[in-house]
Amino acid sequence: MSAEQFVGRWKLVESENFEDYLKEVGVGLLLRKAACAAKPTLEIKVNGNKWHVNQLSTFKNTTLEFTLGVEFDETTPDGRQFKSTITIEDGKVVHVQKRIKDSDHDSVITRWFEGEKLITTLQSGSVISRRAYIRE
């Protein structure tokens, strides 16, 4: 798997169990409803080990900049803070969010390809959400 495969604009086309995932990680009801109604587009740019990911939606636009394998401070769209590390393992991009506050919950976000779709799973505890994107 080449990191270059991820480069481009990706539009959300399928979403399963996303609200349950958001509830598991502690996102409030109003923000959960808004996030579930949004149909985000991902803009991904890669330069060597440095990645730049914009998530664009009517809910909120966010930017994530990171270097593969290097821990960084991450603030989620709803304001939760994590120590995060993103790596490539077995052809998948694995994003580990480790909580800073005891009231938050760790998550693992994994991205890979199935045919022409970019698949994303979000897992916290036993709750797993699956989302699929297609290239714009």
From Swiss-Prot:
GO molecular function, one term: fatty acid binding
Xref: PROSITE patterns: FABP
GO annotations of cellular component type: cytosol; nucleus; perinuclear region of cytoplasm
GO biological process: fatty acid transport
Pfam family name, one: Lipocalin
Binding site for a fatty acid: 111, 131-133
Regions crossing the membrane: none
Keywords in alphabetical order: Lipid-binding, Transport
Superkingdom assignment: Eukaryota
Family membership noted in the UniProt record: Belongs to the calycin superfamily. Fatty-acid binding protein (FABP) family.
Name of the protein described by the UniProt record: Fatty acid-binding protein homolog 5
Source organism: Caenorhabditis elegans
